[in-house]
């Protein structure tokens, strides 16, 4: 119940979801699931110190994916992207932590794996841009929209992270 209240509060007052309470949406794409990289990806975010607040394995509908990627509708690869994302299971996740949107983008690496440095998820595990393993929100605003698309408020778990005092001042 308290988490539901906090989620409603965060939607009414977006500035409340900054700092250590900032959230981002990540999705391991079908190639990442098929290649059995979900655990490795989760491990990297946990080791960084972020808190997992939601996770589910889903077969995304084309309708959901068209809404998720609406801003790319005019791009030539849009149709292929939607079909690809609907071609297999996706692991949808919400992570929470200080500056999690920006930091998760750095952990993921450049959209084009050729531009992603070693040590990033795409730099270590991807070869081509069409199969780049993972989606990560590109802004706090996008994260809010994407989280609301993929998760109901009651699916976002509020829990006390015992390691928090070792991570934040």
Swiss-Prot record:
Report the CDD domains cross-referenced here: NDPk_I
The membrane-topology field of this record reads: Peripheral membrane protein
Q: Which UniProt keywords apply?
A: ATP-binding, Cell projection, Cytoplasm, Cytoskeleton, Kinase, Magnesium, Membrane, Metal-binding, Mitochondrion, Mitochondrion outer membrane, Nucleotide metabolism, Nucleotide-binding, Transferase
Q: Which residues bind ADP?
A: 29, 105, 111, 122, 129, 132
Q: What is known of its domains?
A: The N-terminal hydrophobic region (1-17) is critical for mitochondrial outer membrane targeting and phosphatidic acid binding.
Subunit architecture: Homohexamer. Interacts (via its N-terminal region) with KAT5; this interaction enables recruitment of NME3 at DNA damage sites where it plays a role in the repair of DNA. Found in association with several ciliary nephronophthisis proteins, including NEK8, CEP164, ANKS6.
Q: Which PROSITE patterns match?
A: NDPK (PS00469), NDPK_LIKE (PS51374)
The record, for InterPro entries, names: NDK-like_dom, NDK-like_dom_sf, Nucleoside_diP_kinase, Nucleoside_diP_kinase_AS
Q: What is its EC number?
A: 2.7.4.6
Q: Which organism is it from?
A: Homo sapiens (Human)
| Catalytic residues of the enzyme | 135
In its UniProt record, a GO molecular function of this protein is:
nucleoside diphosphate kinase activity
What GO CC annotations are associated with the protein?
ciliary basal body; cytoplasm; cytosol; mitochondrial outer membrane; mitochondrion
Q: What is the effect of changing residue 40 to D?
A: Impairs hexamerization. Decreases mitochondrial tethering activity
Q: Which SMART domains match?
A: NDK
- Please state what the protein is called: Nucleoside diphosphate kinase 3
Role of this protein: Catalyzes the phosphorylation of ribonucleosides and deoxyribonucleoside diphosphates, other than ATP, into the corresponding triphosphates with ATP as the major phosphate donor. The ATP gamma phosphate is transferred to the nucleoside diphosphate beta phosphate via a ping-pong mechanism, using a phosphorylated active-site intermediate. Through the catalyzed exchange of gamma-phosphate between di- and triphosphonucleosides participates in regulation of intracellular nucleotide homeostasis. Inhibits granulocyte differentiation. May be required for ciliary function during renal development. Independently of its kinase activity, facilitates mitochondrial tethering prior to membrane fusion through its direct membrane-binding and hexamerization. Implicated in repair of both single- and double-stranded breaks in DNA through its association with the ribonucleotide reductase complex (RNR complex) via its interaction with the histone acetyltransferase KAT5, this interaction enables recruitment of NME3 at DNA damage sites where it plays a role in the repair of DNA, independently of its kinase activity.
Q: Which PANTHER family match?
A: NUCLEOSIDE DIPHOSPHATE KINASE (PTHR11349)
Tell me which domain of life the UniProt entry assigns to the organism this sequence originates from: Eukaryota
Listed disulfide bonds for this chain?
Answer: none
């Amino acid at each position: 119940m308290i988490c539901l209240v906090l989620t409603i509060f965060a939607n009414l007052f977006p500035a409340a979801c900054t700092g250590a309470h900032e959230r981002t949406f990540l999705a391991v794409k079908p190639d990442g699931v098929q290649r059995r990289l979900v655990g490795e990806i989760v491990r990297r975010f946990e080791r960084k110190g972020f808190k997992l607040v939601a996770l589910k394995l889903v077969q995304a509908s084309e309708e959901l994916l068209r809404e998720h990627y609406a801003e790319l509708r005019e791009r030539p690869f849009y149709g292929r992207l939607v079909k690809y994302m609907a071609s297999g299971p996706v692991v949808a996740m919400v992570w929470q932590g200080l500056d999690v949107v920006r930091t998760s983008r750095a952990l993921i690496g450049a959209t084009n794996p050729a531009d992603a440095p070693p040590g990033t998820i795409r730099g270590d595990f991807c070869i081509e841009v069409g199969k780049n393993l993972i989606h990560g929100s590109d802004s706090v605003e996008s994260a809010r929209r994407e989280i609301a698309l993929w998760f109901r408020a009651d699916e976002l778990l509020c829990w006390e992270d015992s390691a928090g005092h070792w991570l934040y001042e």
